[in-house]
Amino acid sequence: MGAMNELINATAVKRLVAILDRPLPTVVASIDSLDPLSLRERADLVSEALLVDLPVSYDAVATAFRDALRDPAFSGWIIWPIGETVTSAALRDGSPEAFDDALALMASLTSRLTSEFPIRRLLQADVDRALGIVQSWTSSEDEHVRRLASEGTRHYLPWAIRVPALLERPEATIPILDALYRDESDYVRRSVANHLNDLARVHPELVVSVASKWMSQPDPHTAQLVRHALRSLVKKGFPPALQLLGYHPAEVTVSALTLDTQSVTLPGSLGFSFTVTNDGPESATLAIDYAVHYVKSNGTLAPKVFKLASAVLAPGATQTFTKRHAFRQMTTRVHYAGSHALEVQVNGVQFGSVPFEVVLEPKLSFTHDPRNGP
């Protein structure tokens, strides 16, 4: 994450000071504290410094940033703390006028850098008032603003604080998605799909109901959007989601599941192959997935399902599938040594499993030989 943290660095802060063109001593001093901080912490640090240096009045803060928008250089990740400052100033003011204007300013800022993070505290403060304004963004001519309407109200937006009222009322954002699922911009539609996929974590029936409605009133992109939105439910084998996408229960046999090695040393990979046979009397549309059962820190196994392929098999037909799966340490996954397993999944149904070992790369150690001197 080191390179990511540098998205808000000394150069960016100095450029911000130059653009705002006013004495900002606390902001300048904050540069010395950036190094050990994460990107989120850097955004908070700069925002807190801006709140010290700028006037207390919300109107003065908003005017300073609207003036800065005239400069094309007022862009990039430094906009994150700007948005947080706007939110803090509006909540400090406490008036409905400041609240509404803060959301309007977020819409102006979002083409420079997404405002999806700073609007979360406004949603926390008054979700109904905020959603009323956000709903109006769905008809904006700016695709960045339309995307913000969906992305900023996601229930499990990565990096963002949770909005309890949205978690308690999952249906509250559906009108926003209904207005955007046929948007002309792929950028917006991807956000809609991810938003619906978020909801699928806890409310799969609601998600399938919404997706079914969209499929009954589609445009040329709706089928692809729905497939992306239901991806997690397909991996979980949720029957209504599978059937909506045309993956009905099928009579199939999975055989000859073969691994190219019984032991993977990190970093490394595992190659495998298997065959699927349609034993039924009709053609079968199949979602072919596989699950790796990873060893957790406590020694238990936890499955992670991966997409492999879609296929249509005629009655009696057989098809062979091959895949190579990489194993390497990542910030999002820590590997542990031990007995893992690989399993094939077809239309949400699991077919056996094959064990294999994962071995961590040995750390080099050196033993001093006194004969070699000190």
Model regions: which residues?
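Short acidic, flexible loop segments centered on an aromatic residue
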Residues: T285-K296
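Short beta-strand elements
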Residues: V349-F366
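Short beta-strand and strand-turn-strand segments in soluble, beta-rich domains
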Residues: V252-S255, K296-S310
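Short glycine/proline/serine/threonine-rich loop/turn segments at secondary-structure transition edges
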Residues: Q329-S339
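A beta-strand/beta-hairpin structural motif
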Residues: P303-M330, V358
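Short beta-strand segments of immunoglobulin-like
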Residues: T258-T265
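Surface-facing alpha-helical segments and adjacent helix-coil boundary elements at the starts of domains
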Residues: M1-A241, T265-S273, E282-T285
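Short solvent-exposed strand-capping/beta-turn motif centered on an Asx-Ser/Thr pair
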Residues: T277-S283, V349
